[in-house]
């Protein structure tokens, strides 16, 4: 069906081209006075025939290009297409009025070449601005249409916005977020952006075995979260095409939605704090629920290896907390009692320093 549609379009294009182009050719060839040849019907027939013959070679390329375009458009959210189309329309309207003004001049370059360039450039810029700023336009329209709210309603709305929890790739692969959500410690709606899902799929398709395993684990965690009846899950289909990095997209999305980024990525945590974007690091939660260890407290540990500094030994608690023991190297593979001297607490984890008691 598509093949015949393409051929019909070529026939129409060929007939139109023949009507407007062939009369000048007949005059140059010296046969313009022959009415049987130089008439619109013959010109249209010859042009259509030539273009129809071209379709036997060109139709497969045109069909492949249309299929490629259809696949690309199918992956784009409808809101993106609408705002991109509106931006393109505005750009073309501006180019039309500018071209009309330039056509009044007697300078050949300004009234012929420049209007074409303006149409292409302004049309492209309008399309790109419409896509990249679609979220801001949407918020502007919503704010214009919104009725005047009371302070209580504004407070309730602000509170509901803060209930959006936007998951990043690292926290999904980690897996602990599924258990945290199931227990109800995090309220509100879980937002999973499509660009995060795409990154997970890319990791799951990796040739590296470790990456492939991590990606598939992340997809399994997402399926588990979606199947939980007590968890509200929303998919965000938009994208920020002017921003290639997923972390930067998450920060922008949190600003647009007024939500909170949930992560265990130390660098993303710092970026969110720098840009005043609310962020929850589940490593902070994990550290907060660990048993409190105070300086002077004694504990029994198994020395497993030597430390980085001279004569240091390293042991671990059951929850994985590292204990650095001064002068503990000589006790490797032995169970000894140590006394806590200090505790270092960060978002990356907790480290305990001790000495043999």
Swiss-Prot record:
The keyword Aminoacyl-tRNA synthetase is annotated on this UniProt entry: no
Matching PROSITE patterns: TRAM (PS50926)
S-S bonds: none
Organism superkingdom: Bacteria
Keyword tags: Hydrolase, Magnesium, Metal-binding, Nuclease
Domain PINc: 166-278
Limits of the TRAM domain: 292-353
Family membership noted in the UniProt record: Belongs to the ycf81 family. In the central section; belongs to the PINc/VapC protein family.
Name listed for the protein in its UniProt record: Uncharacterized PIN and TRAM-domain containing protein Lin0266
Species for this entry: Listeria innocua serovar 6a (strain ATCC BAA-680 / CLIP 11262)
């Amino acid at each position: 069906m598509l093949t015949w549609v393409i051929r019909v379009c070529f026939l129409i294009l060929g007939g139109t081209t023949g009507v407007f182009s062939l009369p000048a050719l007949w005059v140059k060839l010296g046969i313009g006075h022959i009415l049987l040849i130089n008439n619109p019907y013959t010109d249209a027939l010859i042009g259509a025939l030539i273009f129809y013959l071209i379709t036997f070679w060109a139709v497969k390329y045109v069909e492949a290009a249309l299929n490629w375009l259809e696949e690309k458009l199918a992956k784009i959210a409808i809101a993106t297409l609408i705002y991109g189309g509106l931006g393109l329309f505005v750009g073309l309207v501006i180019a039309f009025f500018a071209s009309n003004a330039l056509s009044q001049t007697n300078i050949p370059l300004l009234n012929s070449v420049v209007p074409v360039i303006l149409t292409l450039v302004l049309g492209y810029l309008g399309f790109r601005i419409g896509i990249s700023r679609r979220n801001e336009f949407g918020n502007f329209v919503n704010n214009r249409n919104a009725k005047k709210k009371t302070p209580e309603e504004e407070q309730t709305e602000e509170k509901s916005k803060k209930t959006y929890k936007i998951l990043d790739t690292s926290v999904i692969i980690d897996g602990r977020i599924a258990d945290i959500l199931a227990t109800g410690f995090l309220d509100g709606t879980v937002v999973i952006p499509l660009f995060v899902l795409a990154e997970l799929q890319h990791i799951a398709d990796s040739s590296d075995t470790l990456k492939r395993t991590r990606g598939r684990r992340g997809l399994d965690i997402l399926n588990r979260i979606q199947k939980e009846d007590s968890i509200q899950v929303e998919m965000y289909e938009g994208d920020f095409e002017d921003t290639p990095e997923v972390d930067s997209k998450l920060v922008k999305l949190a600003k647009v939605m007024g939500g909170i980024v949930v992560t265990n990525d130390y660098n993303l945590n710092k970026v969110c704090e720098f840009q005043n974007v609310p962020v929850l690091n589940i490593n902070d939660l994990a550290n907060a629920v660990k048993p409190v260890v105070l300086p002077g407290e004694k504990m029994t540990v198994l020395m497993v290896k030597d430390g980085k500094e001279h004569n240091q030994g390293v042991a671990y608690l059951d929850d994985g907390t590292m204990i650095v023991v001064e002068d503990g190297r000589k006790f490797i593979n032995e169970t000894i009692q140590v006394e806590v001297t200090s505790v270092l607490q960060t978002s990356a984890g907790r480290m305990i320093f001790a000495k043999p008691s």
